[in-house]
Amino acid sequence: MTTPAQDAPLVLPAVAFRPVRLFIINIVLTGLAMLAAGLSGHLMVGVFFGIGLLLGLLNALLVRCSVESITAQGHPLKRSMALNSASRLAIITVFGLIIAYAFPLAGLGVVFGLALFQVLLVLSTMLPVWRKFRFGEADGGVLKGSEGEEQQR
C-alpha cells in the first residue's frame, strides 16, 4: 500500500543556503537601486525595493527555521510544511501589498524587491547543486588529479 502524498515523510536535499551572502547581495542591490532611483528622482522606490529584498530574506530565514523544526519531529509530514509555507507567504505578501497600497508609486518597489529576491534565492541554491552534478564536488572547484593531487579548476 502506498502513502498518500500529503502524508508522505518530508525528504529534503542538502542545499547551500548562505543567508550572509544573500544579505550582502541585498545590500549591494539596494544601494544600486537607490542610486538609479535617486538619479531618476524617485529615491523612495529604491528604498522600498530594498525593503522588499529584506522581506524576502526574512522569509527565507523563516523557511529554514520551520524546516529545521518540522524535520526534527519523529515523522515529519509534507502537509505541515505546506501549511506553514502557505501561511508565511500569505502574511509576507499581504504586508508587501499593504506597503504598496499605502505608498502608491514608490511602494511597488517592495513587490519588485520580493520578486527579485526569489530569483536570487533560486539561483543561489541552484548553482551549488548544479556544480555538484557537473563537477562531482560539493564545493565545485577542487577536483582530484590523476596522480592523487588536488587541482584547482
Curated annotation (Swiss-Prot):
Q: Is-annotated flag, keyword Membrane? A: yes
Q: Which GO terms describe its cellular component?
A: plasma membrane
Q: What InterPro entries does the annotation carry?
A: ATP_synth_I (IPR005598)
Membrane topology listed for this record: Multi-pass membrane protein
Q: What is the predominant subcellular site recorded for this chain?
A: membrane
The membrane-spanning stretches of this chain are: 22-42, 43-63, 89-105, 112-130
Recorded hits in Pfam families, A to Z, give: ATP-synt_I
Sorted alphabetically, the keyword list is: Cell membrane, Membrane, Transmembrane, Transmembrane helix
Tell me its family. Answer: To M.tuberculosis Rv1303.
Q: What is this protein called?
A: Uncharacterized protein ML1138
